[in-house]
Amino acid sequence: MRVALKLAYIGTEFHGSQIQPNVETVEKELFKALRNLSIIESPKSADYTCAGRTDAGVHALGQVVAFDTEKPNLAIPRVINSELPPAIWAWAHAEVPYYFDARRSAVSRHYHYVMSGEDYDISKMREASKLLLGTHDFENFSRSNGEKSTVRTLERINVRVDGEITKIDVVGNSFLWNMVRKIVTALSMIGNGVRDNDWLLQMLNPEIYEEGIEPAPPYGLTLMGVNYGENIEWIEDDYSIRRAGEQNHKRILRHRVMAEVLEELISHE
């Protein structure tokens, strides 16, 4: 049977999602868990696929992986989570066709970026975001990774303010390395008046205009979900979702305490 899982993880705990030698990654922990439970023998023999690689520091709520297994009764979130560290958790699973590929079968991906509000002109950022919609060559918004084509299609970009936080949602068919984070940088530069829409249009014409821009920090980015455009019957695991919520509430409290400590340190007279 072929099984797909929805995974969430806290990216700042790992050196990216893709397995690498000598460093902690999401896949390293996932493969270890699946082998320990005898769900798979190896990623290759199980025809393992992943919806998309995330860089070090980037989080996920709806990462999708798929693999073949002879023990589908064990390939469920609450069992797999028993072998995973708290910073990674599976929360839904589904039986999928034998040909399902978590990456190639994807129709679109949704990324969400969170950053401090500052004094951005949100109306300018929203107007600029409209220029990015549709199909463009995003070479100036990527880090070279041997891609055959740098043409991508963006379906939706939404910029909104939530208190002191600015949030940007980006939905597209697929994304280049660092593409979302560089889009965030570009919109931020327009929002604070450093650049304008004419510059953004130039950036979308890499055959004539080339400029490298720094990607926004990875810790603000989350892969929210992957759309497959077909009727996958996901079964959510309420226990796993509830347990992850409890564990991460403790993490939130620790961060709040640490923020208060830092405030006191820098304001001490």
From Swiss-Prot:
Pfam families linked to this entry: PseudoU_synth_1
Residues that coordinate or bind substrate: Y111
Active site: D55
Catalysis: reaction(s): uridine(38/39/40) in tRNA = pseudouridine(38/39/40) in tRNA
Keywords assigned by UniProt, alphabetized: Isomerase, tRNA processing
Gene Ontology BP terms: tRNA pseudouridine synthesis
SUPFAM superfamilies in alphabetical order: Pseudouridine synthase
Molecular-function GO term, any one: pseudouridine synthase activity
EC number(s) stated in the UniProt entry for this protein: 5.4.99.12
Name of the top EC class for this enzyme: isomerase
Function: Formation of pseudouridine at positions 38, 39 and 40 in the anticodon stem and loop of transfer RNAs.
NCBIfam families hit by this protein: hisT_truA
Family classification: Belongs to the tRNA pseudouridine synthase TruA family.
PANTHER family in UniProt: PSEUDOURIDYLATE SYNTHASE, TRNA PSEUDOURIDINE SYNTHASE-LIKE 1
Identification of the protein by name: tRNA pseudouridine synthase A
Organism: Methanosarcina acetivorans (strain ATCC 35395 / DSM 2834 / JCM 12185 / C2A)
